[in-house]
Amino acid sequence: RFKCDWSSDVCSSDLDGSWEGVWRDQIINMRQLTPDSIEVTGTDDRKGISRYLGADDDLEYIISNISNRDPYVAKLAENCPGMRILRQDHWECLATYLLATNANVARIGQMVESVCTHYGKDLGGLHAFPTPKQILDGADTIGECRLGFREQRFVTLADRVESGDLDVESFSDMSYEECFKELQGINGVGPKVADCVALFAFEHMDAFPIDARISKVMENRYGVTGSYKNVSAYGRKMFGEFAGYAQEFLYHADFIMF
């Protein structure tokens, strides 16, 4: 939910960029000053924003770990030294990925923006992602958000979280396998969404999400084909505890080449 003003002098630079968005009910502006430093305005919670950005990750150790397993990924990591995995809000990440099923990026953005505008706290120009209670309180107007077949799933998820039937905060304490299984028990969550949420919200760095792009990479680069379960398991076995980072390097490289 962060956007860059590409018309600004800062964003036209190859070195740095200024991004504005919402984090924890605050409007945040971030600008990369140098390859190793970021200027953040809009919050005093330096520890929190650092954790959100994955700035505390030991990249040297992580990259060494996955590079020892595959020289190709080692090269990709060299070309993208600052890539990190976000620690997104549990509820927001899960709810957003539920909306993302069978939709392109533009459509996903429209749905998330609509939900935030209709139900989220107005922060002055931007809106926070709504809480489960805010969604339930306005559930009678959910049709205005134009979520399509995702509408009832979205409201049901909010109800389960708000009632305590689904304790999403406990998912970080589970093993990857337990988390993956529990997530797939949610209506509308398949294996790809479960892996994405496990990785980006619940810090299971051994998750290895498979979408069409990664599926193509795994086939062309490693000769791995078959079911989602088979390809994902291969990636997790090959790259180990930081398979999620390896997946991001592979995805980024293919995206750039595409």
Report residues per predicted region.
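Single conserved hydrophobic/aromatic residue that forms the stacking wall/gate
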Residues: 2-11
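Short helix-coil boundary/hinge micro-motifs
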Residues: 22-29, 34-48
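Alpha-helical ds-nucleic-acid-binding substructure associated with the helix-hairpin-helix region
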Residues: 46, 50-185, 238
